[in-house]
Amino acid sequence: MKHKPETAAFSLIRPLEAWAANANKACNTKKMLPCLGRKWMRLSTRNLKPTWNLINVVDASKTIVRGISGGAETIAKERVDTVVIGAGVVGLAVARELSLRGREVLILDAASSFGTVTSSRNSEVVHAGIYYPPNSLKAKFCVRGRELLYKYCSEYEIPHKKIGKLIVATGSSEIPKLDLLMHLGTQNRVSGLRMLEGFEAMRMEPQLRCVKALLSPESGILDTHSFMLSLVEKSFDFMVYRDNNNLRLQGEAQNNHATFSYNTVVLNGRVEEKKMHLYVADTRFSESRCEAEAQLELIPNLVVNSAGLGAQALAKRLHGLDHRFVPSSHYARGCYFTLSGIKAPPFNKLVYPIPEEGGLGVHVTVDLNGLVKFGPDVEWIECTDDTSSFLNKFDYRVNPQRSEKFYPEIRKYYPDLKDGSLEPGYSGIRPKLSGPKQSPADFVIQGEETHGVPGLVNLFGIESPGLTSSLAIAEHIANKFLR
């Protein structure tokens, strides 16, 4: 049976930048009723007219304390089974997988909805698994994740298309690098890879110019928002949200067990009696004060730190976790420009140059609506990771002058690109574990066997191919860390 997610009830809309820009806007509580400081009473969704009820368990005006010391006993405590911190695509995938396996999951995110940061600011590409060292987590999860992702998209009618990719060498000096990519892809068991002479590639794509190309037929594109929305729907029994000041229910009546708490920031935590204690607050409440104040103490059996850009900063605020196990943070901003003044996309396939330092190069993608995007570039950002919320930390504006560097790079493989045809699109920040002139780092997934903290799983450096790998990462966490 096919399942198709409903999207009309949500205000997150295309184009992508309009949706992604929500990260810089004030929280809108009309979109979703936050459950911070409240206990959800689950009612059967078997009824034709399901009802809802909320039981207040904390009066924030009377029970707030500072930090995690002293009067911490005065705030409400809530024992929960599993907490997933971060409602990006990986966090959503983890929450879904754990809930499918019978765990009660609470998903916390500082934003007012899911997927507002890195997950909404990328190329929306399904990667085949070519670029990564054999036996690395990136290689393993990308290949497995691609299989799971295509299967999921087909089953639930998520818009996607396996359009293929050409990685191109535009000069003879780049051919050895292309050969290396072919070798890596073969080692990673990526099927269908084929080396093409320049004329063969240009026969496929007449606007292309190259001397050689690597064809990856398994690469593709998908609608990331529809995918994330589906993950949300597959994680919970029902969701309460506000629509014109009326409370409504939305979601499929499935027997999964997950609760979403948006506008919720994890201030800090500590290990006590082999349990992680988390101290949380309403994002808007905490950001309005110089010193953040906890409003609720959560005591979970399992914590998955999937906070993306904020994962390391959060880990450093968990007292009892040795900071030696927290890798350094590096942030790389990537800008995208859209192609204007065209009647039809110049390419049918994804076209990628030879990878550059810090990224895969300024490539061309065509989304499912026919919008042609070029990017991202790489701009290293000097930044510290000592803040509790990343909602307004980064500047996502695209400087139109950056297009001056795009034109010569793109014209290496697309010489007919016209002056003035690039318009600022959007930008994203990549959570990297390696900096400039350093070798690319692998994903880091840590459990108790690494850092010694019971019930804590840290996910660090989940950059590309994080979207493609999301379902495989979730599968791995469920298989390895569920007891």
Curated annotation (Swiss-Prot):
Catalytic class of the enzyme: oxidoreductase
Record-listed E.C. numbers: 1.1.99.2
Principal subcellular localisation of the protein: mitochondrion
Catalysed reaction equations from the record: (S)-2-hydroxyglutarate + A = 2-oxoglutarate + AH2
Subcellular location: Mitochondrion
UniProt superkingdom: Eukaryota
GO MF: (S)-2-hydroxy-acid oxidase activity; 2-hydroxyglutarate dehydrogenase activity; FAD binding
Keyword field: FAD, Flavoprotein, Mitochondrion, Oxidoreductase, Transit peptide
Pfam families membership: DAO
Transit pept. (range): 1-67
InterPro entries, per the entry: FAD-dep_OxRdtase (IPR006076), FAD/NAD-bd_sf (IPR036188)
pH-dependent activity: Optimum pH is 7.4.
Cofactor dependency: FAD
Gene Ontology CC: mitochondrion
Keyword Oxidoreductase in annotation: yes
Changes seen on gene knockout: No visible phenotype under normal growth conditions.
Keyword DNA-binding included in the entry's annotation: no
Family that this chain belongs to: Belongs to the L2HGDH family.
Function: Catalyzes the oxidation of (S)-2-hydroxyglutarate to 2-oxoglutarate. Is specific for the (S) enantiomer and possesses very poor activity toward (R)-2-hydroxyglutarate. Has no activity toward related 2-hydroxy acids, such as glycolate, L-lactate or D-lactate.
Protein name per UniProt: L-2-hydroxyglutarate dehydrogenase, mitochondrial
Gene coding for it: L2HGDH
